Amino acid sequence: MSTYTRRTFLQTVAVAGAAATLPPRLRAEMSKDGLFPAGPNFHASARASVMISGGTITKDGKFTDAVRAAHSLHYGARKKILLVLHATEPDKRDADEQKLKLLFADDQYEAESLHHWTGDEALKKIAGAEAFFVGGGETFLLLRTLIETGQLGAIRERVLAGVPYNGSSAGSNVAGTVIGCTNDFPVVDVPTRASIGVLPVVINPHHPPVGAPDYAERERKIKAYLRLNPAETVLGIGNGAVARLHEGKITIEHGPAFYYHGAEQTALPEGLCPELTALVTAPA
């Protein structure tokens, strides 16, 4: 006997109707795996080099010492950085670009923002990029724009080919498998929580340090999330903290950082992180 009820029909119509209001690029992306596909598996590559920070990466008008050291390690000899500022509201992207250009110039990097190009020209900039920096702001706006423009897959392809990825706050969120533990509001709709997926975890930026007034509440929220999503692992990363995937290993370059899985929560020391590295090396 068929289980396709009137309620099922109405739900299908509602979802399809919502999808019909989305731009063509979004609808095309959604149609590949159904209307709202599940999050992807970790997109692994031995060449992937991915750095994330929890936010608040500057002090006194410069990158913090920890972030500067991490940039030097991560970018190496690559001195041209393509900024991806889609998490910023469109009318503020020029100003954000100028701030970041000055910050990077202090450390002898050249930076330019992808938002000056659209369509195929933007995809060409991604294809020729030496390195990426994906800035913070509105995570849902960032993910929607990446999907709508076709840039999500293009950036993922370059990162898996060895182009360094560096994300801060919202830029950290989209490096993970899904945007499941964002701190910001869903200011726009997205067709799926699935993101770039070059880190094998869900990211929670701006994670409070132990003893901070909001630490216990953040821990409670993440554990509640994991009770509903028990297969996932969450990396909480604090302001000014840095984590890095390189050559198949994940290290905490600067804390605080926290590992969550199931009911377990562990404060991670700096250095190699076996718990997270095991996720990189685990069979698909």
Give, region by region, the residue ranges found by the protein language model.
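Glycine/threonine-rich flexible loop motifs
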Residues: 139-149
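Catalytic nucleophile loop
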Residues: 133-136, 159-178
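General beta-strand structural signal in soluble alpha/beta enzymes
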Residues: 52, 113-115, 134, 166-168, ...
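Portal/gating segments that form or line small-molecule/metal binding sites
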Residues: 89-137, 141
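Catalytic-core regions built around general acid/base machinery
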Residues: 149-162
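C-terminal and late-domain segments of enzyme folds
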Residues: 34-76, 84, 93-98, 131, ...
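N-terminal export signals
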Residues: 2-3, 8-29
